[in-house]
């Protein structure tokens, strides 16, 4: 399973800022915490659209950058695309978490999958104490159309992800303009980590994953997840790759990997 995490904005395309916090800085931190938590689950590979403050596709518009980020994630085999953002409002009273999902006008299953994923993540965020806002889709306001003639989504994340056949969602974690959200979650590492872990937990529930555990006996180490254990396969655990033999024991030292060659 490949999960694409997209820290929204960057140093070129800055996001919202208020109360001493900046969106493009914090979205990267939240995504990094989410990545670390997701990698505690066996069989999950995380693709990050950016790992520094820099724009991954400089020299163009924000829409071009987003389109390329999604294309890169799809090329990496991503099954879902989760874009991390923070909200802002003219009203300092506005607070809480909301998530934007694909519409169901074209490739409706993508929209349905996006709603399922968003519902699970929103539930985890609300469980932290964030105010529950809405999960919604937004259609184009300039009559743009998908291939089937239906109205397209408004945001590039949803449009590009849908074109690649994967659900793209925008998670607006909290408001930079609300002092309660900022003090509880955004101006401290503990709060940012809670947000990232909540995102990861929702994603894991979407895929039906459970955390595994290492065990050791007289023969060696093995890794169990739920009622089953890994065997005869490679697995990425906590960001590192391991190979488990036919009996489920972790191999050590150099291993010979046979690669098939074919023509096309």
Feature names for model-found ranges:
Residues 21, 25-210:
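Active-site-proximal helix/loop segments of hydrolytic enzymes
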Residues 209-264:
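Extracellular adhesion/carbohydrate-binding repeat motifs centered on closely spaced tryptophans
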Residues 11, 176, 247-249:
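Acidic glycine-/aspartate-rich tracts in secreted/extracellular proteins
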């Amino acid at each position: 399973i490949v999960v694409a995490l997209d820290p929204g904005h960057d140093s070129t395309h800055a996001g919202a800022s208020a109360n001493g916090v900046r969106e493009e800085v914090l979205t990267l931190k939240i995504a990094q915490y989410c990545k670390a938590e997701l990698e505690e689950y066996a069989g999950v590979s995380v693709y990050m659209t950016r790992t520094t403050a820099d724009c991954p596709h400089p020299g163009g518009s924000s829409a071009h950058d987003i389109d390329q980020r999604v294309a890169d994630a799809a090329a990496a085999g991503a099954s879902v695309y989760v874009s991390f953002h923070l909200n802002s409002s003219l009203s300092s009273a506005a607070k809480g978490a909301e998530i934007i999902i694909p519409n169901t006008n074209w490739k409706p299953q993508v929209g349905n999958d996006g709603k399922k994923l968003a519902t699970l993540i929103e539930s985890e965020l609300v469980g932290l104490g964030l105010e529950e806002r809405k999960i919604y889709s937004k259609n184009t306001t300039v009559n743009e159309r998908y291939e089937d003639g239906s109205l397209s989504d408004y945001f590039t994340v949803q449009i590009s992800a849908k074109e690649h056949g994967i659900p793209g969602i925008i998670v607006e974690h909290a408001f930079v303009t609300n002092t309660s959200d900022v003090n509880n979650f955004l101006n401290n590492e503990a709060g940012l980590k809670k947000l990232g872990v909540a995102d990861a937990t929702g994603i894991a529930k979407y895929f039906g994953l459970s955390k595994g555990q290492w065990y050791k006996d007289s023969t060696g180490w093995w890794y169990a997840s739920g009622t089953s254990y890994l065997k005869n396969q490679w697995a990425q655990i906590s960001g590192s790759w391991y190979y488990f033999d036919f009996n489920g024991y972790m191999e050590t030292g150099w291993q010979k990997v046979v690669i098939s060659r074919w023509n096309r």
